[in-house]
Amino acid sequence: MDIDPYKEFGATVELLSFLPSDFFPSVRDLLDTASALYREALESPEHCSPHHTALRQAILCWGDVTNLATWVGTNLDDPASRDLVVNYVNTNMGLKIRQLLWFHISCLTFGRETVLEYLVSFGVWIRTPPAYRPPNAPILSTLPETTVVRRRDRGRSPRRRTPSPRRRRSQSPRRRRSQSRESQC
């Protein structure tokens, strides 16, 4: 089965794979962040959002994986085998959990659309040859500000809505002309 845990959220495993593995904070840091920001919602019996549900599942899954790794580590006599198991869990499963936790915490913090915009921006940036791209990668925390700025630029500020006296004078002949044209029709 080809299951993509991000599909229902508008992302894909491939989209997250553009972010380097060292981009994601440690599982411990992500768990602390989730707890600090969303503990009440995560522990609540009420359904909050699909992101909260996914976070709960990822946290429970990580707990089970670490319990299994601890059990295997305790019951394996061969230190080399123990190290292989611990390294495998930390490298492969740890990265997947870090990606999941980061994605859902970021969606709850910044909004899903902003996170998706960031993933696409980063994907474009990383695939662009270094000679043709800006030196710095996009930063997720700045995207909401950028989006807000863009929205402000589309609308007019209250000051611009009130024309200056000079502009009023220049507009009045146009108004008269258009009024006279309307009266002619």
UniProtKB/Swiss-Prot annotation:
Superkingdom, taxonomy of origin: Viruses
Indicate where this protein is primarily found: virion
| 3 X 8 AA repeats of S-P-R-R-R-[PR]-S-Q, as annotated region | 157-179
Which stretches of sequence are listed as region Disordered? 136-185
Instruction: Give a GO cellular-component term.
Output: T=4 icosahedral viral capsid
MF GO annotations: DNA binding; RNA binding; structural molecule activity
Q: Where in the cell is it found?
A: Virion; Host cytoplasm
Basic residues composition bias: which ranges?
149-178
Which residues in this protein are found as Phosphoserine?
S157, S164, S172
Q: Which UniProt keywords apply?
A: Capsid protein, Cytoplasmic inwards viral transport, DNA-binding, Host cytoplasm, Host-virus interaction, Microtubular inwards viral transport, Phosphoprotein, Repeat, RNA-binding, T=4 icosahedral capsid protein, Viral penetration into host nucleus, Virion, Virus entry into host cell
Provide one Gene Ontology biological process annotation.
Answer: microtubule-dependent intracellular transport of viral material towards nucleus
- RNA binding: region residues: 179-185
Family matches, as InterPro entries: Hepatitis_core, Viral_capsid_core_dom_sf_HBV
For this protein, what post-translational modification is recorded in UniProt?
Phosphorylated by host SRPK1, SRPK2, and maybe protein kinase C or GAPDH. Phosphorylation is critical for pregenomic RNA packaging. Protein kinase C phosphorylation is stimulated by HBx protein and may play a role in transport of the viral genome to the nucleus at the late step during the viral replication cycle.
Function noted in UniProt: Self assembles to form an icosahedral capsid. Most capsids appear to be large particles with an icosahedral symmetry of T=4 and consist of 240 copies of capsid protein, though a fraction forms smaller T=3 particles consisting of 180 capsid proteins. Entering capsids are transported along microtubules to the nucleus. Phosphorylation of the capsid is thought to induce exposure of nuclear localization signal in the C-terminal portion of the capsid protein that allows binding to the nuclear pore complex via the importin (karyopherin-) alpha and beta.
Subunit structure as annotated in this protein's UniProt entry: Homodimerizes, then multimerizes. Interacts with cytosol exposed regions of viral L glycoprotein present in the reticulum-to-Golgi compartment. Interacts with human FLNB. Phosphorylated form interacts with host importin alpha; this interaction depends on the exposure of the NLS, which itself depends upon genome maturation and/or phosphorylation of the capsid protein. Interacts with host NUP153.
Name this polypeptide is given: Capsid protein
